[in-house]
Amino acid sequence: MNNQDRVQKPSKPAANSLKQAEKKKREVFKAVLASPYSRRNLWPAVSVELQNNLVDLLCSILEEIGTFNRLSQAEKNSSGLEKPSISEYVIYGFNSCMKALEEQSKKIQSMKLVLNSDHILRYLFVCKLDMTTPLLFQHFPILSAYANVKLIQLPKNTHQKLQKVLGLKKPIEVLVLAKGAAKMYPLLAELAEGVEDVDIEFLRSGPFEAKIKHILTQQTVKK
């Protein structure tokens, strides 16, 4: 067979090919300029030194909880040990922290929050760099603003340190401390209060309503 008899494959799929047919477009709205409603990743700056100091202090505070968690149920029953007092003011785990923050946010909005309670959430620690996708952490600035808590980013690999000190089977990427913990450990409060509050412009009350313009465009959808 000579070169002229060979069948050459098209370099690109034809316009009516199955591959092209699989590509569809859908209509979407996109902001003309940056929208304040989409600026979710506004994290307060925390120096490396402060982050490391906070991690060391947190590990020291949580060690008592870890000792209790490592005991079997039989050991807890036979020894008569109760949870450490600090446990009352510590919440860890993504789902548990989210639920607590959302509940506090609702209480603030409805003006039902007991201001002098030691159980008011005060500090939200997030291992942002240890999370696998931004979807897991990009909402925390807005949520922390609504819940009126300090948002503090911790260094990479802190999730494993928290897992170890708490005696758990899975890494801990989110940790919340209540006001009572700050009373028990004044140094913790002093360090954490050094972090600025989340500042999100559109959450502030203003004389004019924010108007965000959008355009209708198309986005390719692949099957």
Task: Please describe what each predicted stretch is.
Residues 106-159:
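Extracellular/luminal Protease-associated
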Residues 37, 89-92, 123, 140, ...:
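Sequence-level detector for tyrosine residue identity
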Residues 86-88, 122, 170-173:
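Generic structural motif recognizing short loop/turn segments at the entrances and edges of beta-strands
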